[in-house]
């Protein structure tokens, strides 16, 4: 094996491959046709193997990327599958196969990625591709940009699948206020700045408390100390993106607001059912519908993209040095306090979500966390930075990530893609929720610890039912 130029590893990449943290990103892609492995190999040789991160290995101390030659055949695995033995249990076979992979680390003697081709029919696809890469290679935005560079529009095979809008962050001052006099603008600026400083101060104090002692309530979704060493399983559900957009427009909010409202509602109903089951087992089930204990502290770690250009860019633009949409792990976390409780009006969850997200957007919490991790890494080393990153994650309950995907169907070398379900493993949570839009679909993708959560389908059932209840409530009020 030959080696070439060396390049420093980014701060978050150092954290992700530190001792005790081995975070891997996965992308599960369902295809409408059987996958031809030769076509995949040819495409990888032309695209992925030439990418700096996918053709580099880590130095012994994990501080530098070292360019190396890539034998693509070593990274594409096509297991032997006895179709007769599997029968109608294609999805179970795929689930078990992917779960076993979460216990097999990537080979650090070569670039940290592999692709598994499973030509097994399920209810949603004719074949499934399982793409695994170490999170130090790049975050979700980076990996999806790479995926788009390798795919084309199904409707026009000659066009690359660049059907994702580029977006800028919203201005803090409305257009109508900008047209007012200087005095009103000054008052708004002073008030907004004071609120920003106050919110940031409170958020950082809560972060410090979470690092030191503040833990979430132990619930049926809260992980134990050994969660990272347990195998993980994956489950996904496809719901209507159009329904989410209808609610978004009717409630004058963002897609994110709707998704977090749905998530908050569904987890409340799921936990209520779990506590009800426990009371029944203990012989103390009451006739009350609400089985939730009072005062549940339930926080969600939410990933935040730190790039100034928050939409997707062509891969070539992301690889340019000092680009505003650069490749890498340029994201941080904020912690969202979910109100776990039953509401008679499903729209209350949406209103709470909108208020919560508006408050969190007006804070420098995410940027400061990233900055502090960089300083700790530089002064105290990767181990201390990894502990600073992982401690608040361990003390919260779950993590939610939302990624915008292609607005129309894409194909990989003549293989139309049915769905895309991103996820990850190696984290300190028993439940990870990824949400990704694709064409007219929204894919709910769960990574979970089966020793803690035995019924992930019920979480997705609750999300689906919550969406229907919100839409029905808006229809009853004549808002749709």
Curated annotation (Swiss-Prot):
Glycans are attached at residues 252, 395. Induction: Induced in roots and leaves during drought and salt stresses, and upon abscisic acid (ABA) treatment. Up-regulated in the stem epidermis during active wax synthesis. One of its GO terms (molecular function) is long-chain-alcohol O-fatty-acyltransferase activity. GO terms for biological process: response to abscisic acid; response to salt stress; response to water deprivation; triglyceride biosynthetic process; wax biosynthetic process. The chain crosses the membrane at residues 194-214, 330-350, 366-386. GO terms for cellular component: endoplasmic reticulum; endoplasmic reticulum membrane; Golgi apparatus; Golgi membrane; plasma membrane. It is found in: Cell membrane; Endoplasmic reticulum membrane; Golgi apparatus membrane. It is an enzyme of class 2 (transferase). Residues 215-329, 387-480 are lumenal. Expressed in roots, stems, leaves, flowers and siliques. Residues 1-193, 351-365 are cytoplasmic. Disruption phenotype: Normal wax ester loads on leaves. The keyword Transmembrane helix applies. Keywords: Acyltransferase, Cell membrane, Endoplasmic reticulum, Glycoprotein, Golgi apparatus, Membrane, Stress response, Transferase, Transmembrane, Transmembrane helix. Its EC number is 2.3.1.20, 2.3.1.75. The active site is at residue 135. It is a single-pass membrane protein; Multi-pass membrane protein. Pathway: Glycerolipid metabolism; triacylglycerol biosynthesis; Lipid metabolism. It catalyses: an acyl-CoA + a 1,2-diacyl-sn-glycerol = a triacyl-sn-glycerol + CoA; a long chain fatty alcohol + a fatty acyl-CoA = a wax ester + CoA. In the N-terminal section; belongs to the long-chain O-acyltransferase family. Bifunctional wax ester synthase/diacylglycerol acyltransferase that uses acyl-CoAs with 14, 16 and 18 carbons as substrates, preferably in combination with 16:0ol alcohol. Involved in cuticular wax biosynthesis. This is Wax ester synthase/diacylglycerol acyltransferase 7. The lineage of its organism: Eukaryota, Viridiplantae, Streptophyta, Embryophyta, Tracheophyta.
């Amino acid at each position: 094996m030959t080696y070439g130029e060396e390049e420093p590893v980014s701060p978050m990449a150092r954290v992700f491959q530190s001792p005790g943290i081995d975070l891997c990103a996965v992308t599960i892609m369902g295809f409408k046709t059987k996958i031809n492995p030769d076509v995949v190999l040819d495409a990888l040789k032309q695209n992925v193997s030439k990418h700096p991160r996918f053709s580099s290995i880590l130095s012994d101390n994990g501080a530098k990327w070292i360019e190396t030659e890539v034998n693509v055949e070593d990274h594409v695995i096509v297991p032997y599958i006895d179709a007769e033995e599997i029968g109608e249990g294609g999805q179970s076979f795929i689930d078990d196969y992917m779960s076993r992979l979460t216990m097999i680390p990537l080979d650090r003697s070569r670039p940290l990625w592999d692709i598994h081709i499973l030509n097994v029919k399920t209810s949603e696809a004719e074949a499934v591709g399982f793409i695994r890469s170490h999170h130090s290679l790049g975050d979700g935005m980076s990996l999806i940009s790479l995926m788009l560079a390798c795919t084309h529009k199904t409707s026009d095979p000659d066009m690359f699948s660049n059907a994702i809008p580029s977006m800028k962050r919203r201005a803090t001052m409305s257009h109508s206020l900008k047209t007012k006099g200087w005095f009103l603008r000054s008052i708004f600026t002073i008030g907004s700045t004071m609120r920003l400083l106050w919110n940031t101060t409170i958020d950082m104090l809560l972060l410090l408390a979470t690092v030191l002692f503040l833990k979430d309530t132990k619930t049926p979704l809260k992980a134990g100390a050994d969660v990272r060493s347990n195998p993980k399983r994956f489950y996904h559900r496809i719901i209507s993106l159009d329904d989410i957009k209808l609610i978004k427009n009717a409630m004058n909010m963002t897609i994110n607001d709707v998704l977090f409202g749905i998530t908050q509602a569904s987890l409340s109903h799921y936990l209520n059912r779990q506590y009800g089951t426990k009371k029944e087992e203990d012989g103390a089930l009451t006739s009350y519908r609400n089985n939730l204990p009072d005062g549940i502290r339930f926080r969600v770690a939410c990933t935040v993209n730190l790039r100034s250009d928050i939409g997707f860019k062509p891969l070539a633009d992301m690889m340019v040095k000092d680009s505003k949409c650069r490749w890498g792990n340029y994201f941080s976390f904020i912690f969202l306090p979910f109100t776990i409780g039953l509401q008679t009006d499903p729209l209350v969850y949406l209103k709470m979500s909108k208020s919560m997200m508006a408050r969190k957007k007006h804070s420098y919490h995410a940027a400061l966390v990233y900055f502090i991790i960089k300083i700790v890494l530089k002064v105290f080393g990767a181990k201390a930075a990894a502990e600073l990153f992982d401690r608040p994650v361990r003390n919260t309950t779950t993590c939610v990530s939302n990624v915008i995907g292609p607005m129309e169907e894409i194909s990989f070398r003549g293989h139309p893609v049915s769905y895309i379900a991103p996820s990850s493993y190696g984290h300190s949570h028993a439940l990870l929720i990824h949400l990704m839009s694709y064409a007219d679909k929204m894919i709910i993708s769960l990574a979970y610890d089966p020793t803690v959560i035995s019924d992930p389908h019920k979480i997705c059932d609750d999300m689906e039912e919550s969406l229907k209840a919100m839409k029905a409530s808006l229809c009853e009020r004549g808002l749709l």
